[in-house]
Amino acid sequence: MMKNLTLEHIAAACHGTYYGSEEKKSQCIEAVTTDSRKVERGCLFVPIVGARADGHKFIDQVMKQGALATLSERPLGEVDFPYIQVESSLQAVKDLAAYYLEQLQIPVVGITGSVGKTSTKEMIAAVLEQKFQVLKTLGNFNNELGLPLTVFRLREEDEIAVLEMGISDFGEMHRLASIAQPNTCVITNIGTCHLENLGDRDGVLKAKTEVFDHLKPDATVILNGDDDKLVTVKEVQGRRPIYFGLNEEFPLYADEIESKGLKGIACRIHTPKGTFSVVV
């Protein structure tokens, strides 16, 4: 069950107007969905207006299926269920995700980069799962709708969130990172993806590092020191980032790298707290 997220809280977080009975205003939702085919009893339905479909046409259907309430960008008139009218469903779902994550007060590892985000997310989550209850991004739910939906999967028992953030244009990272507000930020590399919007690799660097504007105080920043663009980042929040790579001058580096074929890649990892061998 989601933690203490009442319809009253939702209306305030979304800057929306609540319509419905006072009794239901204090009820907590069980989940949030944008997919009318995946409605759960007690959930909040968020109708997204897309290029090919308008989620508003499914509102009556999902309410009959047991949804507790719905958002709506337009007045619904006299209806027998509670709803919250908002200016934009997409903006509302982002605002609500930021509010919900803030209420949970759990550490967030935010991961971005041109390539390798998903593999890095999986490895970080696998390590953390040895000791903590971890929620991680599933599939490619790393954009302005996918990230909020990932956040809504968090439950009270979760101890750490590992969130992937993918972008294709300037400003997107600002919007994603304002939701995630990472305690730890990892950037894998600066490549040549989305140059149609970002221009060149310097543009990619600028867009990716928008994340720095939304880090929690005293956040840890971990960068690929072998990347010629990321190594130019000398300071974040007044502190030097932690670099990793193949250079033994970095605090975290790998050597003795050897392919084991289908069994993976063997290497030796050097850290400030010791050296160990792994097969990935």
Model regions: which residues?
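Short, charged/polar "capping" segments at the starts of alpha-helices
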Residues: 75-79, 228-232, 251
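Phosphate-binding loop of NTP-binding sites
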Residues: 11-12, 92-225, 229-239
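Thr-Gly-centered strand-to-loop micro-motif
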Residues: 34-35, 47-49, 72, 136-138, ...
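Adenine nucleotide phosphate-binding catalytic loops in nucleotide-utilizing enzymes
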Residues: 201-202, 235, 239-280
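Structural signal for conserved beta-strand scaffold positions within catalytic alpha/beta enzyme cores
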Residues: 20, 47, 72, 85-86, ...
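A structural micro-motif
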Residues: 16, 68, 81, 106, ...
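Residue-level signature of catalytic and energy-coupling elements of molecular machines
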Residues: 10, 62, 147, 188, ...
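N-terminal leader/targeting and accessory segments in enzymes
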Residues: 1-95
